[in-house]
């Protein structure tokens, strides 16, 4: 039953609308539970009434409700919906708490993956992300402004992903169904929602009519074409620009024209005759948008690029056409440091913008070229290159290409010697690549853990957290736990634990909890006088930190009576009793187990004194 529900969730279409991020996050976490669901005992896997089955069913129902529901309603009542997502995440977290998955016959890596996902559900059970404040402000303005600003309505429709009349029809049906299902007006705002929907419809109709009229208007004004503003003309061809780019002098030209000028060997700006400091071409997106708006307003269709089918596909799916990408690759290959720095910086920004850019940039052959630039002597080029690889790695298919290009040793070297921002982004890149299990082994073997620990100690607040996240993910693999312990991470984590002003207690406890499950890690932690800080966290920490501290203390006490007696002497019993009654299910179990160990140790001590 749980497996079937998880499969149904995986089959749901990509989420749309203002709640697409929490929907995507919830779906992703459920998919990561697949290995656990494959190993459930027969009684649990076939039952339809277990806590896990109920929780996954609630997740499926919420995702379906969000998919089919009113996008306007979801935006206007964002807080309530986000609370629902937090509640479902909490329900799954508690169901996993009650499931003794550590007793299942699963590979160690699967056990650790499930534990990691379990912790993700726990974190998601408490709301941290606020609703989209800009969208909330836009909605409030649109509901009071009559008539509404078309640009405002366009921005709202983009955020809600209500672009076409078909989208509007579905939204109208969703609002109608919402009224029927609630037998009235939910929160008394149906009139407002309907009013806003009408404004959005009018906006879409106006745009559709404008688009439909383009062909007719173009035909009727051929004999009286409007005068093209000078700033929209290329200074070389004097024709309307379709792909404006900026050169180092600050002037804007049509890409194909200025590229021909540069390819002919010219090193000056055609208009000002200034020497060009470099030949990089930066897209002028603002001017391109203004030209597009002017063309639409005047019924003019932009001239089409003369491209083959592959080029057209690339142009539609990314911010660059094929020629532009080829130019970027050539600049990466050039021996000119200024060219390489500018090109790497351009790719860094493009790869950050959208998934299509990441795909097209990788297909153009950028990854090996960027990997080569990791060895650049120019710090800024190095920073651009590693950050571009980080942004490209967001697309799953690019991860393998980056690793296959032998990037990991070079990223590790950058992590050791780069500037602070470069080191931070190198750590984030290693974390992104380590999502793939086999890469955890490769990254650890390349010597990444010692420089990550250095960043953990001397980095900026962001750098420390990037390093901690990367180390945690790498330590899901047992061999990397040993590497981290041998590299001396424990003493630094203990220092974080006793420094409440450092802001790293959460990360320290998470890392200690995973390291304490390793025999060598447990020994080193036990030698680091862990009892006083752990007891303090159990007494005064947040619910999550108390749970982790109890888990670490249980691992230490279960194999060492001296640690048990030391914890008892430190006065932790009352806090453990309170935790065993009011904590999370996992915290209750750990606290109760420690209390039993203390009771047993006390009895053994009395018997020893009696002899």
From Swiss-Prot:
Keywords: Repeat, Transferase, Ubl conjugation pathway. Its EC number is 2.3.2.27. It is an enzyme of class 2 (transferase). Pathway: Protein modification; protein ubiquitination. It catalyses: S-ubiquitinyl-[E2 ubiquitin-conjugating enzyme]-L-cysteine + [acceptor protein]-L-lysine = [E2 ubiquitin-conjugating enzyme]-L-cysteine + N(6)-ubiquitinyl-[acceptor protein]-L-lysine. GO terms for cellular component: cytoplasm; nucleus. Residues 227-301 form the U-box domain. InterPro entries: ARM-like, ARM-type_fold, Armadillo, RING-Ubox_PUB, Ubox_domain, Znf_RING/FYVE/PHD. GO terms for biological process: protein ubiquitination. Coiled coil: none annotated. One of its GO terms (molecular function) is ubiquitin-protein transferase activity. ARM repeats lie at residues 355-394, 396-435, 437-476, 478-517. Possesses E3 ubiquitin-protein ligase in vitro. This is U-box domain-containing protein 12. It comes from Oryza sativa subsp. japonica (Rice).
């Amino acid at each position: 039953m749980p497996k079937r529900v998880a499969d149904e969730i995986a089959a749901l279409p990509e989420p749309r609308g203002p709640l697409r991020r929490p929907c995507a996050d919830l779906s992703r976490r459920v998919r990561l539970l697949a290995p656990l669901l494959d190993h459930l005992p027969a009684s649990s896997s076939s039952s339809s009434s277990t806590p896990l089955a109920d929780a996954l069913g609630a997740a499926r129902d919420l995702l379906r409700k969000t998919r089919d529901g009113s996008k306007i309603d979801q935006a206007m009542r964002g807080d309530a919906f986000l609370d629902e997502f937090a509640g479902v995440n909490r329900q799954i977290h508690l169901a996993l708490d009650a499931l003794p998955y550590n007793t299942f016959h699963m590979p160690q890596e699967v056990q650790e993956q499930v534990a990691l996902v379990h912790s993700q559900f726990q974190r998601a059970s408490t709301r941290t992300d606020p609703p989209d404040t800009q969208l909330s402000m836009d909605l409030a303005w649109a509901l009071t402004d009559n008539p509404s600003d078309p640009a405002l309505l366009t921005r709202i429709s983009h955020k809600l992903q209500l672009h076409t009349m078909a989208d509007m029809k579905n939204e109208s049906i969703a609002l109608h169904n919402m009224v029927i299902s609630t037998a009235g007006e939910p929160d008394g705002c149906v009139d407002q929602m309907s009013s806003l929907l009408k404004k959005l419809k009018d906006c879409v109709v106006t745009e559709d009519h404008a688009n439909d009229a383009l062909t007719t208007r173009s035909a009727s004004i051929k004999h009286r074409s409007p005068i093209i503003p000078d700033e929209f003309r290329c200074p070389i061809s004097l024709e309307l620009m379709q792909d404006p780019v900026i050169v180092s002098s600050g002037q804007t030209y049509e890409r194909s024209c200025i590229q021909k000028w540069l390819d002919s060997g010219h090193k000056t700006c055609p208009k000002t005759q200034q020497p060009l400091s470099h030949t990089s071409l930066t897209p002028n997106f603002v001017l391109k948008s203004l030209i597009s708006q002017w063309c639409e307003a005047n019924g003019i269709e932009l001239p089409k690029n003369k491209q083959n089918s592959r080029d057209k596909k690339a142009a539609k799916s990314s911010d660059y056409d094929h020629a532009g990408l080829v130019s970027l690759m050539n600049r990466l290959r050039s021996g000119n440091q200024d060219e390489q720095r500018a090109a790497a910086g351009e790719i860094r920004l493009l790869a950050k913008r959208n998934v299509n850019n990441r795909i097209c940039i990788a297909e153009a052959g950028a990854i090996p070229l960027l990997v080569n630039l990791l060895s650049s002597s120019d710090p800024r080029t190095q920073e651009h290159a590693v950050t571009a690889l980080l942004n490209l790695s967001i697309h799953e298919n690019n991860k393998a290409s980056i690793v296959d290009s032998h990037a990991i040793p070079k990223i590790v070297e950058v992590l050791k010697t780069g500037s602070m921002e470069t080191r931070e982004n190198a750590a984030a890149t290693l974390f992104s690549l380590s999502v793939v299990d086999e890469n955890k082994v490769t990254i650890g073997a390349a010597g990444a853990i010692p420089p990550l620990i250095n960043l953990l100690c001397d980095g900026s607040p962001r750098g420390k957290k990037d390093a901690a996240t990367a180390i945690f993910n790498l330590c899901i693999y047992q061999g990397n736990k040993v590497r981290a312990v041998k590299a001396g991470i424990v003493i630094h984590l203990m220092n974080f634990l006793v420094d409440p002003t450092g802001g790293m207690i959460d990360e320290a406890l998470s890392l200690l909890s995973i390291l304490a499950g390793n025999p060598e890690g447990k020994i080193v932690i036990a030698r680091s006088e862990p009892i006083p800080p752990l007891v303090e966290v159990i007494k005064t920490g947040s619910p999550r930190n108390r749970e982790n501290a109890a888990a670490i203390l249980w691992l230490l006490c279960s194999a060492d009576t001296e640690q048990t007696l030391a914890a008892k002497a430190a006065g932790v019993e009352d806090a453990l009793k309170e935790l065993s009654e009011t904590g999370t299910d996992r915290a209750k179990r750990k606290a109760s187990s420690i209390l039993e160990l203390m009771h047993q140790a006390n009895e053994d001590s009395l018997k020893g004194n009696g002899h």
